[in-house]
Amino acid sequence: MRYALLAASIFALSAHAHADTLVDNIKGETIATDGSLQTFSALLFDDGGTIKAVYGPGARLPKQGRNGYQYHIDGKGRVLLPGMIDAHAHVIQTGFALLTLDLSDTVSLDDALDRIGKFARAHPDRPWIIGSGWSQDRWHMGRLPTAAELDRVVPDRPVWLERADFHAGWANSAALKAAGVTAATVSPQGGAIDRLPDHQPAGVLIDHAADMVARAVPITKARDLDLALATAEADFARRGITAVADMGTSLGDWMAFRRAGDGNHLYMRIMAYAMGTEAMAAIGGSGPTPWLYADRLRMGGVQLLLDGALGSRGAWLKLPYSDQSGTSGTPLWSETQLGNLMSRAAMDGYQVAVDAIGDKANATLLTTINDLTHTYSGDRRWRIEQAQVTDPANWGLVAEIARTGGVVASMQPAHQISDRVMAEVRLGPDRLRGADAWNSLKHEGAVLAFGSDTPVERPDPWTGIAAALTRQDDAGAPTGGWQPQERVDRLTALTGYTSAAAWAGFAETKFGRIAPGLRADFILVDTDPMTATPEAIRKTKVFQTWVGGGKTYDAEPEPVAAKSGTKH
């Protein structure tokens, strides 16, 4: 029922255009083909949702009528921008995070346990308690939580809670038992089981070890995936996001996207990157899929994970962690395995996107890409996802790859805000110069595509733009910005969430800018990101979101006008 209501509410807003529609009385801004800022005062799109014309200030507009446009949208003097694009998102996980137990705002272990207990009591019919968003760093614990602590509030059924970075999970004793994880269980390659002094599993499983519990969770039903997608779509639309790069698309995710498209309720554009080469082959077969549903869905690439997260000390570093000298992190693949997987995808024409967090992971990935460019030439647009900690000594490889097959630094400005204090502890002062090095990587020739990694962070492009400009959190800390030399300018920030994010997914001929021939994906907002203060940008209000000439979100819905020539 909830899915039906969500779908119906969006469908009511998403009526398609019938004949040409003029949007005027706007302050329009978009990125031009040469990368500069282009301003305009009106645009015209057709009944297929494609932009026909863009009019500069003072230009003569067409007339309404039989030989002109039929419908009119009054922009009310608001700012019109291309729809925002989240260059690194997890669509279905975002929906589930909104539907299940959310621990992202808990401030202590006791706070989390209280929330977990209340949630379990409120849902006595759920065979498992599922949730996400916890972080021992945010709780200032200095250690990982345990199964015994979970057992105190939910002793009667399994509990599985993924960490905020989704690179670790916290299980109670019932979940460990259901998964068969015992003192005798060996940690898999690319994973680790946190253990008690007697070698019993303590409760947290990291990276590939977490898969053991995840596989024991009851299989998600198709209707649950559909509800998660509809929930995520509504959340993206209200934030002004019209397209995403969905990283780690499973076959089940893909089928949910296809069901939505077949049912005419896929209300945003999804550039899908399959989770590993097996899912890639299952979805696309011998090559990327074509664009489907009027350019709303395509699987054109594969996502591979090279290491774990910095917060759970899974990120692969060149030197040991500053706060735990016994480990340098966990590579999930050997260098040979990584090269083979990337080659397997590249030979069939798939775009390759690899998550690399630590400086050793990034150095290994850059070397591997550079080697592969000799075999796989042409416009490849190799994607480095996260690129959280890089070694300046390796930046020269970025420039070399940029000259050959092209390289995308797909980065998440909000991570810098939430991870700053933790990164200082994990890395120590000597490695911070290469942390979230947006400006330096851009200078070396990488194309910056910005996203959120939702549900790890909120899919809020306005927080991301403000963070990219200032390297400060919402409270303005730290003064002057963290590693301020890595701040980017306003044009780069806006480009990162629009045209560059489209280019990063080989979609620049479809959407990402306001230009004739591209899809009419746009938003009306109250704030101009090219002139407003960072504080104002963070508070940006989205009034309307349009995808392919159809409205998918309206903050101020009005009754349909009696005159056929007016659109709301």
Predicted segments with their positions:
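Gram-negative bacterial Sec-dependent N-terminal signal peptides
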Residues: 1-17
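Divalent metal-binding segments
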Residues: 21-25, 30, 35-285, 300, ...
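P-loop/Walker A phosphate-binding loop and immediately adjacent motor/lid segment at beta-alpha junctions
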Residues: 119, 535-556
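His/Asp/Glu-enriched, well-ordered alpha-helical/loop segment
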Residues: 227, 342-353, 360-382, 386, ...
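Distinct, well-ordered alpha-helical segments
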Residues: 255-259, 282-288, 362-374, 397-398
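Acidic (Asp/Glu)-rich catalytic clusters
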Residues: 261-264, 288-294, 374-377, 398-406
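Non-cysteine beta-strand/loop elements that form the S-adenosyl-L-methionine
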Residues: 296-314, 403-416
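Extracellular/periplasmic ectodomains of large secreted or surface enzymes and adhesion receptors
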Residues: 554-568
